[in-house]
A protein has these predicted regions:
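Histidine- and/or cysteine-centered catalytic micro-motif in compact active-site loops
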Residues: 1-3, 238-239
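Patatin-like phospholipase
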Residues: 17-55, 63-311
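Sec-dependent N-terminal signal peptides
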Residues: 3-16
């Protein structure tokens, strides 16, 4: 009798574990808004999301959901004027008095230098200022504090204690390795994960200068497998490995130089992959929110009966 009860208990435990679902969200800039539509479809089909891992825009969407935001709340945030301002670095006119404004000059580009040493021919000339980012970081840094502070405090900085256990990935370019965030300020982790080189200013955490997680791991399915070991993995990919660069496209040249190739795949016996082809979507254009959400939703609904788990 005891063996029978024990067998039932073990069977129930295995069954419960096997039903756990992990959601992996790739980076891809504004294309990652598509992830929200996929989440909406999963919710409507009563498919639970037990764990989330994400990179860059996948980290933003994943973190918002992991701290309890609904699909509607995420969509409204991305369509808000506040989001537009902190993603572009634009400072509202009524707040500009809080910031130092440089004296207007007729120059297009100015690179001030300082001399370190008495002799110029010693080549001890160091740049005092060179721009490290195109988008000013102030708006984003200020916005992330109230956005993520409550969730961080409630979880005690432990991502396992969020509404949905969560991981995100950034890149340490000095050590040339991915950095997995499990415990820290949630806003800092997300901010580091989405810091695309030259667009956003890098963040220093624990002495490490961190950039966009997509440099070394743009689709953290391995993090999902190693940290959570779910019974079924749903992947959402809105990016692809860079094409061969061309002479006339400096952006493609930079992408090839900084981005490692990512394995965008999930084994058939481990889950299902949604691979969205969004070639006509600008990764820095965050305006077509409803369109991208609908694309993610429609694609998921097509595959719900044949490829997704049933509960």
């Amino acid at each position: 009798m005891r063996r029978f009860v024990l067998a039932l208990f073990i069977g129930a435990t295995v069954s419960t574990s096997a039903q756990k679902v992990g959601l992996v969200l790739s980076g891809g800039g504004a294309k990652g808004i598509t992830h929200i539509g996929l989440i909406k479809a999963l919710e409507e089909n009563n498919i639970p999301i037990d764990y989330i891992t994400g990179t860059s825009m996948g980290a933003i969407v994943g973190s918002l959901y992991s701290m309890g935001m609904s699909v509607e709340e995420m969509a409204n945030l991305l369509k808000s004027e506040d989001f537009s301002q902190w993603s572009s670095g634009e400072i509202p006119p009524e707040l500009r008095y809080n910031y130092h404004n440089a004296t207007p000059k007729p120059t297009i580009v100015e690179l001030p230098f300082s001399l370190n040493g008495k002799r110029i021919d010693s080549l001890q000339i160091k740049a005092r200022f060179l721009p490290t980012n195109l988008v000013p970081p102030h708006q984003m840094n200020y916005a992330f504090v109230p956005l993520y502070a409550q969730a961080t405090a409630a979880a005690g900085g432990d991502f396992d204690k969020l509404f949905v256990p969560f991981r995100c990935v950034a890149s340490d370019v000095y050590k040339k390795e991915a950095v997995i965030f499990r415990k820290c300020q949630l806003g800092d982790a997300v901010r580091a994960s989405m810091t695309f080189p030259f667009v956003y200013k890098p963040l220093t955490i624990d002495g490490r200068l961190l950039f966009d997680g997509g440099i070394f791991n743009n689709f953290p399915v391995d993090v999902m497998q190693n940290d959570f070991k779910p019974g079924f993995i749903i992947g959402s990919v809105v990016s692809e490995n860079p094409d061969k660069p061309t002479e006339s496209d400096p952006f493609s040249q930079v992408m090839v130089m900084i981005m490692n190739k990512t394995n965008y795949s999930i084994a058939k016996n481990e889950g299902f992959l949604f691979n969205f082809k969004l070639d006509d979507v600008d990764m820095f254009d965050f305006t077509p929110v409803d369109k991208l959400i609908k694309m993610g939703y429609d694609s998921a609904m097509v595959h719900q009966d044949t490829h997704l788990p049933h509960f």
